[in-house]
């Protein structure tokens, strides 16, 4: 059902309609976004008169450079309308048609933005989990994922090794640190990617922080300039309102909120009697393979996770990625307890909601029409 890209769009739009309906009935307090991607637009009143096409950049660019370098390191900062946009601009700027983009990940597969950008650049693409493997001789760009969509984190020694391998071959390194810029540094005590020698690093300002959905890139000034040039060419750069919100989010970032998630996770797991869960740095995931009552139904793991996610949303107001994520995003049922809403949801309420979702889906998983309506509307 979800292999069809059109159905992926229908699935997401159905979930957004459910959120809209719940907002009308219960207001924002009836929604608990546990995706870790809820973002925010923390503008101050004084910012509103400045978010114009030309005035905005004149005011906020200097602040962006200062706050961005403090968060990411590097010589220069650039802002993009999404992390995927930043990756696309970097691949277009730094690769040659026919060359190879070589991608290291803690766990396969890649976020679709990396192979997709490579295809648009008419370059070849290879990915590996082996951080000792050397890239092919025709490699023009090495990409390293600092933390996967399911929060698998690269070890600092592996990251350093890959950077050294690439630099020995004269290849620039881009670290996709979408959530890793905070996970790696705050919870694992790792250094910032640019401090480890990465030429470029990019993070999402809505992941594990309260900023807007946007991409913040740091790195060597000469490369940032090339990437920015390509971004302007294709309209990938962040606009003034987004840049202003990024600046405020960076200024307000509080690492302790991520650390508090560990306490919430421990409280949840202590009395949870449901299916087997797998811990993540800031929460937990439920894999469809652990849901024995739902196996053998003819539905694959992605569809089962999405069905559960839809019930959690429609019945309990709990937002998770399988329901609302962009087409192609991971369908792992992940609960991020570092999310802003995690601070106001009762842990017992979350447990009971999960039990209820499993029970309801078990009751009609053999009814194809009900499953289709549940997932696609």
Swiss-Prot record:
SUPFAM superfamilies: PLP-dependent transferases. GO terms for molecular function: L-seryl-tRNA(Sec) selenium transferase activity. The keyword Nucleotide-binding does not apply. Keywords: Pyridoxal phosphate. InterPro entries: PyrdxlP-dep_transferase_arc, PyrdxlP-dep_Trfase, PyrdxlP-dep_Trfase_major, SelA-like, UPF0425_MJ0158-like_C. Transmembrane segments: none annotated. Its cofactor is pyridoxal 5'-phosphate. The modification N6-(pyridoxal phosphate)lysine is found at residue 207. Pfam families: SelA, UPF0425_C. PANTHER family: L-SERYL-TRNA(SEC) SELENIUM TRANSFERASE. Belongs to the UPF0425 family. NCBIfam families: pyridox_MJ0158 (TIGR03576). This is UPF0425 pyridoxal phosphate-dependent protein MTH_1914. It comes from Methanothermobacter thermautotrophicus (strain ATCC 29096 / DSM 1053 / JCM 10044 / NBRC 100330 / Delta H) (Methanobacterium thermoautotrophicum).
